[in-house]
């Protein structure tokens, strides 16, 4: 049985909830959810991959259990979501990782990949709109 831990990371004062499973020394895969969902959407996928991958599935800002600041205090743009998730990967110690993007997670993940291509080992796109 796969153990999935639930954690929070403080990203520059912003609380990001995430699910984590798999061996820390395995290849890392960042799972970015769609709209209007959360990391909970990966509840069936994580156990299927956790024997081979280190999996981390955050709730994007404003979704799930992550902080949801007002629109007046936080710009809910894909650029800003990518900045928060990029910092999130730094805070939790990711150096290089693959990114799995789904739907709304695609513009976020693709922007992250464009900003830091040296950190991205692969991009897996599922039901994703075109372009960053």
Describe each PLM feature range.
Residues 1-15:
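N-terminal cap/lid segment of alpha/beta-hydrolase-fold proteins
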Residues 14-68, 88:
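Conserved HGGG/HGGXW glycine-rich cap/lid loop of the alpha/beta-hydrolase fold
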Residues 9-12, 19, 57-102, 130-131:
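Active-site loop/oxyanion-hole signature of alpha/beta-hydrolase fold enzymes
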Residues 48, 52, 94-132:
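Conserved hydrolase catalytic core segment
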Residues 2, 39-42, 78-82:
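A structural signal for well-ordered alpha-helical scaffolds and beta->alpha junctions
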